[in-house]
Every structure is written in structure tokens, then in C-alpha cells.
From Swiss-Prot:
Its main location: mitochondrion. Pathway: Energy metabolism; oxidative phosphorylation. It is found in: Mitochondrion inner membrane. It is a single-pass membrane protein. One of its GO terms (molecular function) is oxidoreductase activity. Belongs to the cytochrome c oxidase subunit 6A family. One of its GO terms (biological process) is oxidative phosphorylation. Component of the cytochrome c oxidase, the last enzyme in the mitochondrial electron transport chain which drives oxidative phosphorylation. The respiratory chain contains 3 multisubunit complexes succinate dehydrogenase (complex II, CII), ubiquinol-cytochrome c oxidoreductase (cytochrome b-c1 complex, complex III, CIII) and cytochrome c oxidase (complex IV, CIV), that cooperate to transfer electrons derived from NADH and succinate to molecular oxygen, creating an electrochemical gradient over the inner membrane that drives transmembrane transport and the ATP synthase. Keywords: Membrane, Mitochondrion, Mitochondrion inner membrane, Oxidoreductase, Transmembrane, Transmembrane helix. It comes from Thunnus obesus (Bigeye tuna). One of its GO terms (cellular component) is mitochondrial inner membrane. Disulfide bonds: none annotated. This is Cytochrome c oxidase subunit 6A, mitochondrial.
Length: 9
């Protein structure tokens, strides 16, 4: 699956 940019804010 295409993973979105993981941005843990």
C-alpha cells in the first residue's frame, strides 16, 4: 500500500 508521509507531531 502507498504509505503517506508519517509525520508524528
Amino acid at each position: 500500500k502507498e504509505q503517506p508521509e508519517f509525520v508524528p507531531y
